[in-house]
Each structure stands twice: as C-alpha cells, then as structure tokens.
Amino acid sequence: MSFQLAPYLAKSVPGIGILGGIVGGAAALAKNARLLKDKQITGTEAAIDTGKEAAGAGLATAFSAVAATAVGGGLVVSLGAALIAGVAAKYAWDLGVDFIEKELRHGKSAEATASDEDILREELA
C-alpha cells in the first residue's frame, strides 16, 4: 500500500498545521509566480512572501483545528469556530509580521527616544 500523506498528517494538530502550510504556501507560490513573471516582484521577494504565507496558513490551520475540536457541537458550530479561529490567527500573524518588518526596516537603535510601549501604542492606534 502506498503512503497516504493527508491521512497521516491529519492524525495530529502539528500535522494539520503542516498540511495547511503546504496548501497556503502553494497558493502564495502561485500568486508570486505570476507577479514574478510580470516583473512586479523579485525572486527574493517572492520567496520571502511565500514562506511567510505558508507559515501563517499553517499556524491558522492548526489553531482552527484546535478551536473546532474544543468547541465541539454540530457541523455548523464546528465550521463557525474553525473559520473564526483561522481568521483570527492569520490576522494576528500578519500584524506580527508587519510589525517585525517595520522594526527591521527602521533599524531600532539603542539611542531611540521612543520606548517599546510607545512604538506598540503607535502601531495599534
């Protein structure tokens, strides 16, 4: 009998997250391949974006599975919980990635006048 990847990964939450990362990464790669072909982004930008999207999709998928399992209930309740949890996780992931990228672009220096709390408050406003 041949190896069955999806059923194997579906046996655990990390496996479900990996499967979500594969699917999310494939979708991002398809999008970035078109942008790369049209010379709208560089190869490096495509690779970085694909990696970020794959990781975010994997995290959101795993979180979604945990939420649906924890809530239980019928099909509609489980689907609703999975959708809400997945959206929340991906939204939080994207905010975090954007914040980190902004910090890296601006080069946080030791002599910075703004405290970490001020920067976070500015980002959340």
UniProtKB/Swiss-Prot annotation:
Listed GO CC annotations: magnetosome membrane
Other noteworthy facts: The most abundant protein in purified magnetosomes. This bacteria makes up to 60 cubo-octahedral magnetosomes of about 45 nm in diameter which contain membrane-bound crystals of magnetite (Fe(3)O(4)).
Organism: Magnetospirillum gryphiswaldense (strain DSM 6361 / JCM 21280 / NBRC 15271 / MSR-1)
Cytoplasmic side: 1-8, 86-125
Induction / repression: Part of the probable 4 gene mamGFDC operon.
Domain notes: The lumenal magnetite interacting component (MIC, residues 36-56) probably binds magnetite.
GO terms assigned for molecular function: metal ion binding
Protein name per Swiss-Prot or TrEMBL: Magnetosome protein MamC
Membrane topology qualifier: Multi-pass membrane protein
Domain of life: Bacteria
Consequence of gene disruption: Single gene deletion leads to slightly smaller magnetite crystals, but no other measurable phenotype. Deletion of any 2 genes encoded in this operon (mamC, mamD, mamF and mamG) decreases crystal size regardless of the protein combination. Deletion of the operon leads to smaller magnetite crystals in irregularly spaced chains, but no other phenotype. Deletion of approximately 80 kb of DNA, including this operon, leads to cells that are non-magnetic, lack internal membrane systems, grow poorly, have reduced mobility and take-up and accumulate iron poorly.
Alphabetic keyword roster: Biomineralization, Iron, Magnetosome, Membrane, Metal-binding, Transmembrane, Transmembrane helix
Family: Belongs to the magnetosome MamC family.
Protein's cellular compartments: Magnetosome membrane
Iron as UniProt keyword: yes
